[in-house]
Design a protein with these regions (language model features):
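Domain-level signal for soluble alpha/beta catalytic cores
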Residues: 1-285
Length: 285
């Protein structure tokens, strides 16, 4: 039942260090204010046994950062720094590429159906992807993607800029068959599986009880990557997670996920270093 252990939610680890995150840039805000806190949070996951770390660039985009007064130079520097902060000996770094909805800071990454053109989506992703290529990560973590159109836009940009960095695309999902936009997860898997350079396709920031039906419904030559949250629901109005996560791993049916093709497993929101440490022995079975 062996699998590669991914880290958990970066914000969860940072909050465990006593930091309050209420900026629209979330963990990305610390890239300017206190980058060592990000480094310390990554260290918690290394100590917990994670073999892949996802960088702090999820919220960093030219559009989103401009809204809070960052210069273009600030954005460029932050993107490069985010990868550097996640470098540890023997650990792989996945540069996070968050969705367009993350820059809107209104929970759109859990809905999709953005009011933006296809070319607008490509322009949004192109500049930061070009910079992240220069940061030389091991992988791209293209994550929490809520709609097929955005996945297609990113795939076109990757081809156009000539990136050869392996990547995964993981989708936020809303039901046993659909991603957040209401489109079929099976169609999402098909799009990624047909693309050049993809190393995995999967699911993140999704309730863990949905993972088995989602994976059971699809076939792919690519391995699956799975990193659900604890099952709590994000409230964009209060910017808080609603519900209990007293036993965050109770719905993590790891053995079944692996049998369905998952080879990389970790956690997302509200899954912290403690939970990743609990998963480590299971990754070695």
């Amino acid at each position: 039942m062996s699998f590669t252990l991914l880290d958990g939610g970066l914000s969860t680890a940072i909050e465990s260090l006593g930091e309050s995150l209420n900026s629209s840039l979330w963990t990305g805000e610390l890239l300017r204010r206190d980058p060592e806190k990000i480094r310390d949070a990554h260290q918690l996951y290394v100590d917990a046994g994670a073999k892949i770390l996802i960088s702090s660039s999820y919220q960093i985009s030219f559009m989103g950062c401009k809204r809070v007064g960052w210069s273009e130079e600030d954005v460029h520097s932050a993107l490069l720094l985010s990868t550097e902060l996640a470098r540890f000996s023997g650990i792989k770094v996945a540069a996070s590429v968050g969705p367009y909805g993350a820059a809107l800071a209104d929970g759109s990454e859990y809905r999709g159906n953005y009011k933006v053109t296809f070319d607008g989506l490509k322009d949004f992703h192109r500049r930061r992807l070009e910079i992240l290529v220069d940061s030389k990560p091991d992988y791209f973590a293209i994550e929490t993607i809520p709609e097929l159109r955005e996945a297609q836009a990113i795939l076109e940009v990757i081809t156009e800029i000539g990136s050869e960095i392996p990547y995964w695309i993981s989708f936020s999902c809303s039901s046993k068959q659909t991603i957040s936009s209401g489109e079929l997860f099976s169609d999402a898997v098909k799009i990624v599986s047909q693309s050049k350079g993809a190393m995995a396709v999967g699911i993140n920031c999704t309730a863990p009880h949905l993972i088995i039906p989602l994976l059971s419904d699809v076939k792919s030559h690519l391995p699956f990557i799975v990193y659900p949250n604890s099952g709590r629901i994000w409230d964009p109005e209060t910017k808080t997670w609603q519900g209990s996560d007293n036993d965050a791993l109770s719905s993590f049916e790891i053995k079944k996920w692996v049998s369905l093709g998952a080879t990389i497993i970790g956690g997302c929101c509200s899954i912290g270093p403690k939970e990743i440490a609990q998963l480590k022995p299971r990754s070695l079975d």
